[in-house]
Design a protein with these regions (language model features):
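Sec-dependent N-terminal signal peptides
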Residues: 8-20
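A generic, residue-level signal for flexible/boundary positions that often mark functional hotspots
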Residues: 19-22, 253
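Subset-of-secretome marker
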Residues: 2-10, 29-291
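C-terminal motif of bacterial Sec signal peptides marking the signal peptidase cleavage site
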Residues: 24-27
Length: 291
C-alpha cells in the first residue's frame, strides 16, 4: 500500500473511539418500544429512586430517546504503544433517535468537522490530511452500514442504529450503583455496567467469537442517569487491536460522552457530493487488519 493510502486510512481510524461513543448514544429508539410515552413522561424523581439499579439502566434507553435531540460533548483518550496520551475532544449536536449528528473534533492543532447523516460518516479533514484525498476532494465519507455488513464494525458497539438498546436485557448482577454525582450541574446517579458480549452478538456465533477475541468476555461501561431517567454521561473503555506498525499490542481507548440541552435543534446536511471522496473500502480493509 502506498503512503497516500496509509495516511488516509489513518484519518479514517484516528477518530474510531469517537465513532464508538457516538454509536452508543445514537439511534437509541431501535428495538422494543415498551410502555407508553405518557407514562414515561409522568415518571418523577420518586419513581426513579424506587427502581433497582438494573431497572434504572434498562429504562434509560427509552427515556433518553424521548428527548429526541441533545447537545453532545466527547473526550476520547488513547493509551498504549505509539498512541500513548493521544486525546481527541468533540462537541456538537445529535438526533438521539436516528443518529444524525454534527461534531467539531479537536486533536491538538488539528480540527475535523464530522457529520453523520443516514448512517454515513463524513469528515472534513485538516489541510495536510485532505491533500491525500483523490481529485482535490475536501471531505471523506464512510458508509457505516456497509462497513458493518463487510465485517468492519461491531454490532452493538459501532452500529449507529443500535446504541443503548442492549442495556434492556441486563440483570441485577450486571449493574452496580456507585453513588450520586453532579454532571454539568445536574444531580445524577452513577452506575457501573458490565455488558454481556453474548447478548450483544444477538445469537451470531461468529460475531460473538470476534467480539471476545477483540474485547474479552465483558465490556465495562459507566452511566450517570438523572432523576428523570435520562443518561447525562456515559463512559466506556475498550482494549482494541490497532492496525499497522503497532502489531499485536493492544491499545486502551476510553470514551466519555456527556449529553445536555435536550430538545436542541439538529439540522445536519451531507456535504456536496462533488467535494466528497468515498473511503468505505479503505476503512473496511483497515478494520479487518485490526481485528
Amino acid at each position: 500500500m502506498n503512503g497516500s493510502s496509509r495516511t488516509t486510512r489513518g484519518a479514517v481510524f484516528g477518530s474510531a473511539g469517537l465513532l464508538v461513543g457516538v454509536a452508543l448514544l445514537s439511534g437509541c429508539g431501535s428495538g422494543d418500544e415498551g410502555g407508553s410515552k405518557d407514562s414515561d413522561k409522568a415518571g418523577s424523581s420518586d419513581s426513579a429512586q424506587a427502581q433497582s439499579p438494573a431497572e434504572a439502566v434498562q429504562a434509560t434507553n427509552e427515556k433518553t430517546t424521548q428527548a429526541e435531540t441533545a447537545k453532545i460533548a466527547m473526550t476520547v483518550t488513547t493509551s498504549g504503544g505509539q498512541a500513548q496520551g493521544k486525546k481527541v475532544t468533540g462537541d456538537g449536536v445529535m438526533d438521539l433517535q436516528d443518529g444524525t449528528s454534527k461534531l467539531t473534533l479537536d486533536q491538538g492543532p488539528n480540527t475535523i468537522e464530522q457529520r453523520v447523516v443516514d448512517q454515513v460518516l463524513y469528515q472534513k479533514l485538516p489541510k495536510k490530511a485532505a491533500e491525500q484525498l483523490p481529485d482535490g476532494k475536501t471531505w471523506m465519507k464512510v458508509d457505516l452500514g456497509e462497513l458493518q455488513t463487510r465485517g468492519g464494525g461491531n454490532k452493538g458497539l459501532n452500529d449507529p442504529a443500535g446504541s443503548l438498546a442492549y442495556t434492556k436485557s441486563l440483570s441485577e448482577k450486571n449493574v452496580e450503583k456507585l453513588g450520586t454525582e453532579k454532571v454539568g450541574g445536574t444531580k445524577t446517579t452513577h452506575y457501573r455496567v458490565r455488558l454481556d458480549l453474548a447478548k450483544m452478538a444477538k445469537g451470531d456465533a461468529a460475531q460473538q467469537k470476534k467480539l471476545r477475541e477483540q474485547l474479552g468476555d465483558e465490556v465495562p461501561m459507566e452511566l450517570w442517569i438523572d432523576d428523570k431517567g435520562m443518561t447525562r454521561r456515559q463512559e466506556i473503555e475498550l482494549q482494541v487491536q490497532p492496525s499497522g506498525a503497532e502489531g499485536g499490542k493492544k491499545q486502551k481507548v476510553k470514551t466519555v460522552v456527556e449529553l445536555s440541552d435536550f430538545g436542541t435543534e439538529v439540522d445536519v446536511q451531507p456535504p456536496p457530493s462533488g467535494k466528497t471522496a468515498d473511503m468505505t473500502d479503505q476503512a473496511a480493509k483497515g478494520a479487518k487488519q485490526s481485528s
